[in-house]
A protein has these predicted regions:
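Short, solvent-exposed helix-loop connector elements
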Residues: 52-59, 372-380, 396-412, 427-439, ...
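Acidic, metal-coordinating catalytic cores used for nucleic-acid/nucleotide bond scission
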Residues: 225-233, 254-258
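An anionic, glycine-rich sequence signature occurring as long contiguous blocks
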Residues: 2-18, 248-389, 393-395, 451, ...
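A short acidic (Asp/Glu
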Residues: 160-161, 233-240, 260-264
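Dynamic "connector" segments at or just before major functional cores
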Residues: 1-174, 180-200, 206-221, 242-243, ...
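Short amphipathic alpha-helical "interface-anchor" segments enriched in bulky aromatics
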Residues: 85, 90, 274, 281, ...
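Conserved nucleotidyltransferase catalytic core and NTase-mimicking acidic/glycine-rich helix/loop elements
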Residues: 7, 428-451
Length: 487
């Protein structure tokens, strides 16, 4: 009977064992062994010595570099708040990877951030910029001295009014409104300006651009700026047109009365744009998902709150014209897109079967004259990457939580987060240059890997499990890291 029973057992049957908890007295194990790649990158960059230049402490028990590195490690392992550094501190194997580093307690990390002033925050920003210069040289070669940068802002909500300089934003959200500048092709952050919530979208944008364009000029002959309608301003356009700057720009246009007259002019010819013949299906899908539909989605969300629904009824059409903005006193090229949509009210019974059709318009102003309308649209449509970068910086990296009560402490935390963000970009650039993934996927593939950490006289050995079949991958990445950094 027993044999017959075993023979007929379901193929889905599992014999889940009984469990017992023990702690090893000799072997160090971590679930974040992939951080040895980050540790090697940090070692080769001489990052520890550079952060000592901050000179925040007079009497040092724990140096500035250790505090900053603790916050970086916390973000790489998935910590959302300073409090989570206690789990980094509890991981002895992880500390061994970073040279028996002494991890400060969470409240000590908080105290460290609160020591930052305007001067030390600027110093931290400059140190991170110097680290980035080496990778700007590499990007210059990779992209043939041409680069596209993307400027945007984002609102961070806080609760209560205990955080210094927090205020009501244009979205009626109480908090902060930082300005972010990305490298469009790679997602690398060039700069962050931390601002009160009440700051206008473009506040500080010209100063940010001036500081960063001067950094890029030695490495890139062509610089293109992409920006949203919040940066449709005379000061920004004039900056781009300055004789000593001369960069190209594509900025989302406002739709005011003079622009409407141009859009509705009888002579205006609207055509369906030609699609690139060399695009793969995946590229088309990715491009279309970020085309001006993200603007259309904003309209859809807004109307849904009023009980309306929007449906697309027509093909995408494009047109262009030259227009002189009165305040700018100069003529520029405007490129616009439109799509026929239908609006229907689902709440009001009297209008349930009534629908109105109209065109939804979205356009840009540019000083680029040597590219076709399709090329301009293709480039600006990909600006949706910036929205995804900001979302991943907030949610993936974990900057959504504002850690301290002090304004410059929070600014410093955002700069340290920028360092974490860029370390990921720099690491991938070396070991998998074609790979662009979000933080959740990055941690899963590269960081969250269990291994024994064994310290010997000459090495710290990363010993993966017997059945772990990705040892060759990690060996390949480590070799690439060593070769690139030694080159």
């Amino acid at each position: 009977m027993k044999k017959s029973h075993n023979k007929n057992r379901s193929k889905n049957h599992l014999d889940i064992p009984n469990f017992k908890i023990e702690q090893s007295k000799k072997i160090e194990i971590t679930a974040n062994s992939g951080l040895f790649l980050v540790a090697e990158l940090i070692k080769k960059m001489d990052m520890i010595e550079k952060f000592a230049e901050l000179d925040i402490f007079v009497r040092k028990t724990i140096g500035e570099a250790i505090h900053i590195l603790t916050l970086v490690i916390n973000q790489f392992t998935g910590g959302d708040a300073i409090y989570d550094t206690k789990y980094v501190k509890a991981d002895g194997a992880l500390q061994t990877i970073f040279g028996d580093m002494h991890i400060p307690a969470p409240h000590t990390s908080g105290d460290f951030l609160e020591r930052f002033t305007e001067q030390t925050t600027d110093k931290l920003r400059n140190i991170i910029w110097k680290m980035q210069d080496n990778y700007l040289k590499k990007l210059s070669k990779r992209f043939n001295r041409k680069i596209t940068i993307s400027l945007d802002s984002s609102v961070y909500e806080v609760y209560g009014n205990c955080k210094e300089n927090s205020s009501q934003s244009y979205k009626n959200i109480f908090g902060f409104h930082p300005l972010l500048l990305h490298i469009h092709q790679t997602g690398e952050l060039l700069d962050i300006i931390f601002r009160p919530g009440a700051a206008f979208t473009s506040t500080g944008a010209v100063n940010m651009l001036e500081a960063n364009i001067s950094r890029l000029k030695p490495y890139f002959d062509e610089i293109i700026l992409l920006a949203d309608a919040g940066f449709y301003e005379k000061a920004i356009v004039q900056f781009c047109e300055r004789d000593d700057i001369k960069i190209k720009f594509i900025i989302t246009s406002e739709i005011n009365n003079p622009i409407r007259q141009q859009l509705f002019a009888p002579e205006r010819i609207w055509i369906e744009p030609d699609q690139p013949t060399d695009e793969k299906d995946a590229q088309v899908k990715h491009r279309d998902s970020h085309s001006f539909n993200y603007r259309l989605q904003a309209l859809t969300d807004q109307l849904r709150k009023k009980g309306n629904v929007v449906k697309i009824r027509g093909a995408l059409e494009v047109a262009e014209f030259d227009h002189t903005v009165a305040a700018w006193k100069k003529t520029f090229r405007f490129v616009f897109k439109r799509q026929l949509i239908m609006k229907q009210n689902l709440v009001d019974q009297s209008e349930l079967f009534e629908a109105t059709e109209e065109y939804f318009y979205h356009g840009y102003v540019t000083n680029i004259d040597d590219q076709s309308i399709e090329q301009i649209i293709s480039l600006i449509d990909s600006r949706g990457h910036q929205e995804n970068f900001i979302k991943d910086f907030k949610r993936g990296l974990g900057t959504v939580h504002i850690p301290t009560k002090h304004f410059y402490g929070n600014y410093a935390y955002f700069l340290i987060s920028m360092l974490s963000w860029n370390l990921k970009c720099w690491l991938l650039y070396i070991i998998e240059p074609e790979l662009q993934i979000y933080w959740k996927r990055f941690r899963y593939l590269f960081i969250k890997v269990g291994a024994q950490i064994i310290k010997t006289g000459r090495y710290v050995i990363i010993r993966f499990g017997k059945n772990f079949d990705r040892v060759a991958e990690f060996s390949k990445w480590f070799e690439r890291l060593l070769q690139s950094l030694d080159a």
